UniProtKB/Swiss-Prot annotation:
Gene3D superfamilies: YVTN repeat-like/Quinoprotein amine dehydrogenase (2.130.10.10)
Keywords: Repeat, WD repeat
Descriptive protein name: WD repeat-containing protein 31
Start and stop residues of the WD repeats: 60-100, 101-140, 144-183, 186-225, 276-319
Keyword Repeat: yes
Disulfide bridge map: none
Cited Pfam families: WD40
SUPFAM superfamilies named among the record's database cross-references: WD40 repeat-like (SSF50978)
InterPro entries: G-protein_beta_WD-40_rep, WD40/YVTN_repeat-like_dom_sf, WD40_repeat_CS, WD40_repeat_dom_sf, WD40_rpt, WDR31
Highest taxon above the source species: Eukaryota
Recorded name of the encoding gene: Wdr31
Amino acid sequence: MLLLDGQLKPALPQKVFCRLWAVMGKLQSKLRHSTYLYSRPDGIIEERVQTKAPQEYIPVHVDTVSVIATLNSDLCISGGKDKTAVAYNWKTGRMVKRFTGHEREITKIACIPKANQFFSASRDKTVLMWDLQGSSHPRQQLSGHAMVVTGLAVSPDSSQLCTGSRDNSLLLWDVGTGQCVERASVSRNLVTHLCWVPSEPYIVQTSEDKTIRLWDSRGLQMAHMFPTKQHIQTHCEVSVDGHTCISCSSGFGGEGCEATLWDLRQTRDRMCEYKGHFQTVASCVFLPKSTALMPMIATSAHDSKVKIWNQDTGACLSTLSLDGSGPLTSLAVGDISSLLCASFYRGVHLLRVDHSQGLELQEVAAF
């Protein structure tokens, strides 16, 4: 029941409420500017309002964008609730190709950049392989999970694919033949994300059971389990050198809602935590080395904020509030100064990281 004008009224049906919420979010995005925290050269952090409106391109998805990944220096691949994957040139604002084949929402994307190919996972329990230069129909279908597929990771040599699901299992596939070659299952291990360690046979995996696991792809055996966290681990990312990984946590009201840096070498200890979001942190990435003197990471969360952190100290260097976008679902690195951020209500945001005077994070386009 709802209290309106001092009287109890019947609550809105769920579908109507969801549509109303989406409309309110989109309206809010047109009425409010994005705000961000600017880190000045003298170390002072101040809040600013972005006065220059971002370029608004025609949205490539008609519903929530669940995942974004970069295929090469110009193209990104996005997937969402509209069941399609889209190849998009984020530098020119032009859609390159739409891929249709899944029966339900796309949950994950994993790219093979050198081959211009990618995999998509879905709530329809399948994984499809696509070729940018080929047909708009899938090149290959991998079926083996009993529930929604929630993890995808391609091996460094692109010969193997690891998939994970809410069915508690991980499957290892031969990309060339499309055959499942290994299977592993752990009770209550509801997979949320997978990431292959560069130049290594290891796979990092996050789970709803609040743990981060390290798997050896040689036989698909669990090699290590990091200390259990207090909240669901939603995502993970491995550094380019393979020495560290980040995981991020669910939460609400600032409880949980953090990202954590882990050592993947001998000690495998927790190295740093990044706290400042107020809702579930859905994605985390290492930023490429830049003119900045410090290594940095970025996070996006359901509180509509993207944050940049000093990787070594845990200090928040910049915060961008994407008002009206709703929960932010996925982050991807475009290039040394660009981030791509997927959202519930406003598609994909192109963000610019500017180091010319201090540190600024601003939205420059949406599609």
